[in-house]
């Protein structure tokens, strides 16, 4: 994120002395400066000023993130996943957003997981890539070394690689926190075509700087009612060995002899932020607009789009639902969040469903949907889409919640 922010106590000049307040006439101790930067020293970065040495590790041990293995989508089929079936109601209160994620789909570039959570997560740091966590339902407080967020329905939280943070659900037991987690092996950012060469959102972008929420900080241990010298465990996800079921992704638990919320100030252009899908201004036209018109983020070999309530095609002979199309270079994943998705009527897909349309197979409206859409002026639908440019494989959760029927849902017409 190229938009500069500064919070808390920082020195006038970078890489110069920044000290704690003097005590009894004695000079205060130095704060410890940390550069958190992307692409070595060649891209966005922030400087954080810690009370403690950020490299400190008192103890460590291996941990597992469970079954992260994947299975090829073979035979090649479109799939309908039902992630709402994955979490028994009794288990939700003990499940957290981080360790409770269940892998739906993945490849070497991106992994898509689902979680229904009622418990506080451990302190967590993803050392593999950036994350986007979309809040389907519920509310949470997210505490990070940059500051805190209050997140709720429709929020995308974008978390840079190696950001220490934790999730604390704040909704009722009847309204658990439902999240879909997009974990990249790269960075995630707004599409380059939305930005000037200096990183400002351009006029044609469907959202802009005013729509982004930045962390509220600084946030210190005492601000959350905890002690700054408490031993604290931080769970780190990273590449490694492990059994075949790990998918090459393992964890290490670091014990710190202090609380991770020890940043008295920071500044720079790298930090987590929130964007709410309701602030996305849809692009419409006289005839049907293709998915790139609905893009919100991009990563290496994948994009994220959202389809929001909007006025639809207004040519007198327009067909508002999509035409049939073959993703010759990509797999398409659609998460149906809310509303009435016209193109999928009759397929069994509803709120909370996820469809996978793989490359090599043409997909489009269900039988009768095109005719039924004629004359429609508005679509009341909300969906999040991820298109990948390498084939996706099925994770354990994807295999567990596949309805097994979707591939035949187009078979009732054309005879």
Residue spans of the language-model regions?
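Jelly-roll (double-stranded beta-helix
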Residues: 1-415
């Amino acid at each position: 994120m190229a938009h500069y922010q500064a919070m808390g106590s920082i020195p006038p000049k970078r890489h110069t002395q920044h000290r704690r307040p003097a005590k009894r006439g004695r000079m205060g101790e130095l704060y410890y400066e940390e550069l958190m930067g992307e692409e070595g020293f060649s891209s966005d970065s922030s400087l954080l000023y810690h009370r403690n040495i950020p490299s400190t590790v008192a103890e460590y041990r291996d941990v597992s993130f469970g079954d992260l293995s994947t299975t090829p989508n073979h035979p090649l089929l479109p799939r309908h996943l039902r992630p709402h079936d994955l979490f028994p109601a009794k288990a939700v209160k003990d499940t957290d957003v981080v360790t409770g994620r269940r892998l739906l789909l993945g490849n070497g570039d991106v992994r898509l997981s689902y979680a229904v959570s009622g418990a506080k997560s451990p302190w967590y740091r993803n050392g593999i890539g950036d994350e986007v966590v979309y809040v389907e339902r519920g509310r949470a407080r997210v505490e990070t070394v940059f500051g805190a967020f209050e997140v709720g329905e429709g929020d995308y939280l974008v978390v840079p690689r190696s950001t220490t943070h934790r999730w604390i659900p704040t909704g009722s037991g009847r309204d658990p926190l439902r999240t879909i987690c997009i974990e990249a092996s790269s960075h995630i950012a707004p599409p380059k075509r939305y930005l000037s060469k200096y990183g400002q959102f351009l006029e044609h972008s469907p959202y802009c700087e005013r729509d982004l929420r930045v962390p509220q900080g600084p946030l210190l241990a005492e601000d959350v009612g905890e002690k700054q010298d408490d031993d604290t465990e931080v769970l780190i996800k990273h590449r490694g060995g492990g059994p075949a079921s790990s998918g090459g992704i393992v964890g290490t638990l670091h014990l710190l002899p202090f609380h991770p919320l020890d940043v008295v100030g920071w500044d720079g252009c790298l930090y987590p932020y929130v964007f709410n899908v309701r602030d996305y201004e849809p692009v419409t036209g006289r005839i049907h607009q293709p998915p790139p018109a609905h893009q919100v983020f991009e990563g290496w070999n994948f994009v994220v789009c959202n389809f929001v309530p909007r006025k639809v095609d207004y040519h007198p002979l327009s067909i508002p639902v999509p035409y049939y199309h073959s993703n010759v270079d990509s797999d398409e994943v659609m998460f149906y969040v809310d509303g009435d998705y016209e193109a999928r009527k009759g397929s069994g897909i509803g709120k909370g469903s996820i469809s996978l349309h793989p490359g090599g197979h043409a997909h489009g409206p269900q039988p009768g949907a095109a005719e039924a859409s004629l004359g429609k002026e508005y679509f009341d639908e909300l969906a999040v889409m991820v298109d990948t440019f390498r084939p996706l494989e099925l994770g354990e959760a994807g295999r567990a919640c596949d309805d097994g029927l979707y591939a035949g849902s187009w078979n009732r017409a054309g005879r």
